[in-house]
Amino acid sequence: MKILGIESSCDETAAAVVEDGNKILSNIVATQIPFHKMYNGVVPEIASRKHTEWILPVVKQALAEAGLSLKEIDGIAATGRPGLMGSLLVGLTFAKTLAWSSNKPFIAVNHMLGHLYASHLENDIPYPYLGLLVSGGHSIICKVNNFDDIEVLGTTIDDAPGEAFDKVAKFYNLGYPGGAVIDKLAKSGNPKAANFPMPIIHKEGHKYDVSYSGLKTAVINQIDQFWNKDFEKTPENIAAAFQTRAVKILLRPLLDASIDTGLKTIVAGGGVAANSLLREKLAEHKELKCIFPSLKFCTDNAAMIAGLGYHYLKRGDRTPFTVEASARVEGFSKKGRQ
């Protein structure tokens, strides 16, 4: 089955054609970073307008690169949740209209499950495994039983790691996007320049949860309190000290979950999965098999949406054209199909 995937949940307008869940025939991503860089963050109104402008040429390019006409497409998948409402509406409405007018099967999928599926585009990964979803809006540690069946073990109780990276980068004028900039700066800095605090939340059912509000506050508002006076307060040192603590906050509950569940395969997804220190630290655990998507599949893309959509459509699932976009995902903290 050849599936056309469409993704527009935030600030990337993307379309891809994927055959049988993992054979990528095309993968087009039009990024809006230059339009949001001056604001050090995504402006929803600008994002939705750019999606409206770009969605048709991006889809046409995806079909052309795949060497296929719309008639040769077996189904259409699009992100339906979660994300920025204005952005989601553009891609979802376009996909529904295209599917209806061409009489193609249609499925709306969960963007976060798409990120979790991204590694399947390049690897044959048996279920179950331990999933790590880390992005600007989410931090989820979960047991993955199937492509649509996950059991959430832990999540963030306040801020997501990607949001912390972005806020720290914005406060210190390090650049945009924050995650990539901090990762690059940290390579030239000393992680011992500051000893930022670890959150103490791993009690009373929070063993696998994470918290980033305290770290964010410490780096932005209380940096002198935790700074090592032997080091100069440079952007590189700030980035290195912050990133080291941010990654450690993730690793502790993740490794605990691996021990407690007995799952030795960890599959990561989401924008923060591109972080080089996170990859490096997990690679040190030789007892684990840690699988990361290629960097191009960590950021938002439509190949993961098409790949995931294939499994729903193959099973016979269909989404009615009355489906509406949703900025949030209800029940994502509970066990069950998503």
Curated annotation (Swiss-Prot):
It comes from the Bacteria. It catalyses: L-threonylcarbamoyladenylate + adenosine(37) in tRNA = N(6)-L-threonylcarbamoyladenosine(37) in tRNA + AMP + H(+). It is found in: Cytoplasm. One of its GO terms (molecular function) is N(6)-L-threonylcarbamoyladenine synthase activity. Binds 1 Fe(2+) ion per subunit. It is an enzyme of class 2 (transferase). Fe cation binds at residues 111, 115, 300. GO terms for cellular component: cytoplasm. GO terms for biological process: tRNA threonylcarbamoyladenosine modification. Keywords: Acyltransferase, Cytoplasm, Iron, Metal-binding, Transferase, tRNA processing. InterPro entries: ATPase_NBD (IPR043129), Gcp-like_dom (IPR000905), KAE1/TsaD (IPR017861), TsaD (IPR022450). Substrate binds at residues 133-137, 166, 179, 183, 275. Its cofactor is Fe(2+). Its EC number is 2.3.1.234. Required for the formation of a threonylcarbamoyl group on adenosine at position 37 (t(6)A37) in tRNAs that read codons beginning with adenine. Is involved in the transfer of the threonylcarbamoyl moiety of threonylcarbamoyl-AMP (TC-AMP) to the N6 group of A37, together with TsaE and TsaB. TsaD likely plays a direct catalytic role in this reaction. Belongs to the KAE1 / TsaD family. PANTHER family: TRNA N6-ADENOSINE THREONYLCARBAMOYLTRANSFERASE (PTHR11735), TRNA N6-ADENOSINE THREONYLCARBAMOYLTRANSFERASE, MITOCHONDRIAL (PTHR11735:SF6). This is tRNA N6-adenosine threonylcarbamoyltransferase. It comes from Treponema denticola (strain ATCC 35405 / DSM 14222 / CIP 103919 / JCM 8153 / KCTC 15104).
